[in-house]
Amino acid sequence: MRSATIVSAVLFSAFSAVHLIDDFLSGVPGEFNLTIPITLLLSFAYMLALVGLIVAASCRSPTSYLGLTIAGLLIFLAQLLKSIPEMIRPGSWHLGLPSEIAAIGLGLSAGMTAVCSYLAWRATRHADRRMS
């Protein structure tokens, strides 16, 4: 399950980067009254945390599996509750089809990461119990 976790998390980070760029180009930070420097700082912190969790997961850290589960679940829910309803409204969303592909890819990869990471976390816990 560790390999599936790493692969899905790498996809999650790739779609996150693309979606962040799309959000910048579409003026999303302005919707939340965020300045460009603050938005850049938040983007940096998000990507640093996500990549850090992937690195830790590659070392079989149970805590990183739990962190990726939570991150994946939160982003999956954000896409489901915010982006999908906006996309199904009439008219184009953000920059059209490329934006929609990025948002759907982000949601799916985040969901896959949440599931795979949770299963890896459970497997790690069960292995630890057997060792005790």
What are the residue ranges of the model-derived segments?
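N-terminal signal-anchor transmembrane alpha-helix
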Residues: 1-30
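Interfacial segments of alpha-helical transmembrane regions
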Residues: 1-11, 61-72
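Structural motif marking the loop-to-transmembrane transition
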Residues: 1-2, 6, 37-40, 63, ...
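Membrane-water interface at the C-terminal end of transmembrane alpha helices
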Residues: 2-4, 55, 106-131
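Core segments of alpha-helical transmembrane spans in multipass integral membrane proteins
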Residues: 14-18, 23, 35-59, 70-73, ...
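Short hydrophobic alpha-helical membrane-anchoring segments
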Residues: 16, 20-23, 83, 119-122
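Interfacial non-cytosolic loop connecting adjacent transmembrane helices
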Residues: 27-35, 79-104
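Hydrophobic alpha-helical membrane segments
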Residues: 66-86
